[in-house]
Amino acid sequence: MRLLEFTALSSLLVLFLLLAVSAEQCGKQAGGARCPSGMCCSNFGWCGNTQDYCGPGKCQSQCPSGPGPTPRPPTPTPGPSTGDISNIISSSMFDQMLKHRNDNTCQGKSFYTYNAFITAARSFRGFGTTGDTTRRKREVAAFFAQTSHETTGGWDTAPDGRYAWGYCYLREQGNPPSYCVQSSQWPCAPGQKYYGRGPIQISYNYNYGPCGRAIGQNLLNNPDLVATNAVVSFKSAIWFWMTAQSPKPSCHDVITGRWTPSAADRAANRLPGYGVITNIINGGLECGHGSDARVQDRIGFYRRYCSILGVSPGDNIDCGNQKSFNSGLLLETM
């Protein structure tokens, strides 16, 4: 309702239906989700294989060859690293950054280890090894800052401060739902739940599925591997970090300077920097409305880790004045 003002009841009903459709199946309306079985994704976010879905000017992704929008790039496959990330973050730095991860009160005690991180990181070409030393350090700081926010056990008066308590949690707290969305491409396994696990708290079958395929693990049938195998756990987070989800760039490309904002990005104040990474991860809830405590928590971790690694945070670290990547999508389809 906040996008357009309608006075006629019929217009309100049309908007309601469009909103329901816009988040239904694929494309920018569904966070970059892809259609199963080779079907086309229409401009309105539905999957199909007729001209209404695949025809020129009617298809936004997974389109037939020929004129039309470019399909979403494939998920990057982990490969040999072009350098050694241990030159950027040592074991002692890792322990200093995640100082209280092994506290007795932390659910993830003794799970997140330096060796597991290094093993996982070396499986992804370019992670922590792209660009000059400044860019490499910022990527490591940004990755651990965002994942520390997702797994934090800190509070304002915590020993050593709230930003020394990243990686305290391993599984989503409370009584989470199954996070199963009907999908022929990534079907949920009987009895399995796809709630948040690991450093990035990966959720939903449509994330566990492609992540597992990329790292060589059947996470649809065994999602808890993300919470029982530390290398797999770190790989799930790095996979998310390295993977673009249209219309969003990858976190990796943003922090390493490989992403160039479009005119629409610039108009939305989405400029290169740590703030865009927060926008990628949770911009729909946290960005675009001024100061937000969750955003400030992410920034607090980032500043601390940059200090430990000996690098400046760079520009545009907040997203309070940025529009989320999903804002305005309804207008673009009308």
From Swiss-Prot:
Residues 328-334 form a propeptide. GO terms for molecular function: chitin binding; chitinase activity; endochitinase activity. GO terms for cellular component: vacuole. InterPro entries: Chitin-bd_1, Chitin-binding_1_CS, Endochitinase-like_sf, Glyco_hydro_19, Glyco_hydro_19_cat, Lysozyme-like_dom_sf. Its EC number is 3.2.1.14. The active site is at E150. GO terms for biological process: cell wall macromolecule catabolic process; chitin catabolic process; defense response; polysaccharide catabolic process. Residues 64-84 are annotated as: Disordered. Belongs to the glycosyl hydrolase 19 family. Chitinase class I subfamily. Defense against chitin-containing fungal pathogens. This is Endochitinase 3. The gene is CHN14.
